């Protein structure tokens, strides 16, 4: 099973570029154009963003081959879970994955399964080979540009939670996720002191 992904832009990106160019023109009705853009590309999705704790430090200490090994292993572990839980892997960036789910409950379930899978994997690995996963999840209206990219406040919030806020083994979610989703069995929420830009609140998912 391959774990390398190539995403090609197409008609959606071309259409968006034309609308943006029109929006930049003199006398453009920006409100009307914005409505057209949202009508064409606006969709509601759950967004899951993963990051690996301590990854950059390990690359500096152990070299590029270690980098490639860790990336490969994380994909090998996580991609089958994404597919099983009805996710769409939109893109990979270094040690991070950007994943979309139609249903928030699928995103939460997948996040818990990811954490349990990597923790089990780590039990038999030396420290520098462990996959220390951080996860952020958002949910809401976003602009989906074909299969090339997504934009929106909840996208930004999910990325901030996963990359900048979450520690190893943590799953952090936005307030919108907490209001929308049914939590996995046996789990609970702990409010965070601060929320990323684009979210009104944020929580730590305490899972079993």
Segment roles from a protein language model:
Residues 95, 136-140, 174-178:
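Short loop/turn motifs enriched for small/polar and acidic residues
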Residues 1-34, 168-208:
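Intrinsically disordered, glycine/charged-rich C-terminal tails and inter-domain linkers
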Residues 99-100, 142-146, 180-181:
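Short, solvent-exposed loop/turn segments at secondary-structure junctions
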């Amino acid at each position: 099973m391959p774990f390398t992904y190539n995403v090609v832009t197409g008609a959606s990106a071309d259409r968006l570029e034309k609308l943006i160019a029109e929006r930049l023109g003199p006398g453009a009705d920006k409100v009307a154009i914005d409505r057209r853009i949202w009508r064409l590309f606006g969709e509601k999705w759950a967004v899951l963003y993963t990051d690996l704790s301590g990854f950059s430090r390990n690359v500096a200490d152990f070299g590029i081959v270690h980098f490639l090994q860790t990336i490969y292993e994380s994909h090998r572990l996580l991609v089958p879970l994404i597919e099983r839980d009805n996710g769409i892997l939109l893109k990979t960036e270094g040690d991070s994955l950007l994943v979309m789910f139609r249903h928030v409950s699928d995103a939460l379930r997948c996040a818990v399964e990811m954490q349990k899978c990597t923790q089990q994997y780590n039990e038999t690995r030396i420290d520098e080979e462990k996959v220390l996963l951080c996860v952020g999840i958002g949910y809401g209206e976003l602009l989906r540009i074909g299969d090339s990219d997504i934009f929106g406040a909840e996208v930004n919030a999910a990325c901030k939670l996963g990359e900048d806020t979450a520690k190893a083994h943590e799953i952090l979610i936005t307030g919108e996720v907490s209001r929308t989703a049914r939590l996995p069995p046996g789990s609970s929420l702990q409010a965070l002191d601060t929320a990323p830009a684009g979210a009104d609140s944020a929580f730590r998912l305490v899972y079993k």
